[in-house]
Amino acid sequence: ASDVYKRQIQSYAPVLTAWKEFEPYEVVATTYQAISGAGKTFADWPEMVGNIIPYIGGEEEKSEKEPLRLWGKVEDGVIVPAQSPVITCQCIRVPVLNGHTAAVFVKFKKKPTKEELIDRLVHFSGEPQRLELPSAPKQFIQYLEEDNRPQVALDVNYENGMGISVGRLREDTVYDWKFVGLSHNTVRG
């Protein structure tokens, strides 16, 4: 599962990992994926200018299953996926060169406060940070308070493109919380 963040889940799986102690059990996500994720530029895909494509073959299934592999365990040399959270996802190709954005809704078994969620995000670190690897972002996840963030134009290169930007964290009427995550798909991937 080492390449799991290389895909479309990199804008939300690390966020959910930071919140694991609150036991997220149901997730709805829509990803808005840059054309570079398809190996394209606007020069060789001009029909994407001013357009969206509401289907990316195979991405939705990966978006729902790969986080469970990431959070699973190894038994007898085989990855056994986690059983929770249940994830449903739609993946949309958007006219952006670099940067995958995700709009995510989450239900928790132990509903946290907004302050607890933000605290876990800004203090989250993993093995790359502990090992102080040269490409590891010093602060893996940043939280942006402004209502109009994260934005691809302003935030995709956070921590040299290796970090994740999160914003728009607010309570939801159907789920517990919702947020928007952004990551650089070609630098992180």
Where do the PLM segments sit?
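C-terminal substrate-binding/catalytic lobe of Rossmann-fold NAD(P)-dependent oxidoreductases
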Residues: 25-177
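Short, structured patches in soluble enzyme cores that scaffold and shape functional sites
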Residues: 6, 31-33, 183
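Flexible, small-/acidic-enriched active-site or ligand-binding loops
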Residues: 185-189
